[in-house]
């Protein structure tokens, strides 16, 4: 969801960069918007030093002064050998076993602990199955074939998707359940699956986010769309400067003079979750996975209701994956 503020498209719920390798998904979204060529190349700030993300040869050169892939690989393998971890018992040990101590302590530890609200030694190892390490000089965060930002913003793209469709807002499904059920052959429910069943087995857990957005009287605040802050002592995980998603360009001639002298930035803070907050990330530990299985068994018995999306299926979805899931579901139902 984006809002146009003085010609700058502001990502209200944090940075969203569209990326996919699915041609079907790319062709689908391009029916509703033209995409720019934005490439996500975040940087990480740790104790006043900037490092390129994801971990690549530019990162390794900054960390150790190495210039060749062989030197970088040798350095990482040396640190992994020194750690001597064969069976990681927690996230910290898992990360060190994958990339060594230097990368972990500077670029993984603090960020991850802020993200989850727990010490890395208290987090299960399975949270990090792998850490992408590239032995090339390439700062493109994603490996996908297609990438970009919809020109005019995501809100405009969704408006185009919904053209000709009746949409009712601010309607609570549970307050109007009988009415909605009576007029539809199928119900697509994208809310929390545990709420649908009145939390009969207990509540699923989530992590939330909160955002602080400010306007500065400068045309360029940080020189990049996304800067990660990996020190634990800094409470936010990243700062987003929205105009860089569209290369500093403004929307409409009337906005050019305004946006040239101002910029809008958002600080992103990980947050605990309760029912009054937005659920952003599922917490897929053993307890929640078992709980979801119970709700899924109930959902599988439904003849009319389909549970979709992050909340309905209790899983993390990138934008392209949830669109592909929706298209596949439509193929099955229609």
Where are these regions (language model features)?
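C-terminal segments that line or cap access tunnels to active or ligand-binding sites in enzymes
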Residues: 184, 195-334
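A conserved beta-strand/loop capping segment in the N-terminal third of enzymes
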Residues: 1-11, 17-72, 131-136
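A short acidic, glycine-rich active-site loop
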Residues: 12-16, 147-148, 211-214
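Active-site/ligand-binding neighborhood in enzyme catalytic cores
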Residues: 44-51, 58-186, 190, 195-197
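Conserved beta-strand segments of alpha/beta enzyme cores
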Residues: 9, 34, 166-168, 304
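Aromatic-acidic/polar surface patches that form glycan- and anion
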Residues: 17-18, 84, 147-154, 228-229, ...
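Conserved beta-strand termini and adjacent loop/short-helix elements that scaffold enzyme active sites
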Residues: 38-40, 170-172, 242, 308
């Amino acid at each position: 969801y984006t809002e146009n503020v003085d010609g700058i498209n502001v990502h209200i719920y944090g940075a969203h960069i569209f990326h996919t390798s699915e041609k079907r998904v790319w062709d689908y979204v391009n029916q509703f918007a033209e995409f720019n060529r934005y490439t996500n190349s975040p940087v990480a700030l740790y104790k006043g030093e900037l490092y390129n993300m994801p971990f690549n040869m530019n990162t390794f050169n900054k960390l150790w002064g190495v210039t060749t892939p062989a030197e970088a690989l040798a350095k990482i393998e040396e640190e992994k050998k020194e750690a001597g971890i064969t069976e990681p018992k927690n996230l910290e040990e898992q990360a060190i076993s994958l990339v060594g101590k230097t990368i972990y302590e500077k670029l993984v530890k603090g960020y991850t602990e802020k993200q989850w609200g727990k010490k890395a030694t208290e987090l299960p190892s399975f949270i990090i199955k792998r850490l992408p390490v590239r032995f090339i000089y390439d700062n493109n965060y994603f490996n996908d074939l297609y990438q970009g930002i919809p020109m005019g913003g995501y809100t405009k793209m969704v408006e185009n998707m919904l053209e000709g469709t009746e949409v009712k807002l601010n309607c609570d499904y549970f307050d109007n359940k009988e009415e909605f059920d009576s007029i539809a052959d199928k119900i697509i429910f994208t809310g929390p699956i545990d709420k649908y069943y009145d939390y009969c087995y207990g509540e699923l857990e989530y992590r939330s986010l909160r955002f602080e957005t400010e306007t500065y009287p400068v045309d360029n605040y940080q020189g990049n769309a996304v800067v990660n802050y990996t020190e634990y002592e800094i409470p936010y995980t990243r700062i987003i400067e929205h105009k860089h998603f569209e290369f500093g360009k403004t929307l409409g001639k009337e906005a050019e003079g305004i946006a040239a002298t101002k910029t809008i930035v958002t600080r992103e803070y990980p947050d605990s979750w309760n029912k009054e907050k937005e659920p952003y990330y599922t917490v897929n530990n053993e307890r929640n996975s078992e709980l979801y299985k119970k709700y899924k068994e109930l959902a599988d018995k439904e003849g009319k209701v389909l549970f979709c999306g992050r909340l309905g299926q209790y899983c993390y979805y990138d934008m392209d994956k949830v669109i592909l899931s929706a298209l596949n579901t439509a193929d099955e139902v229609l």
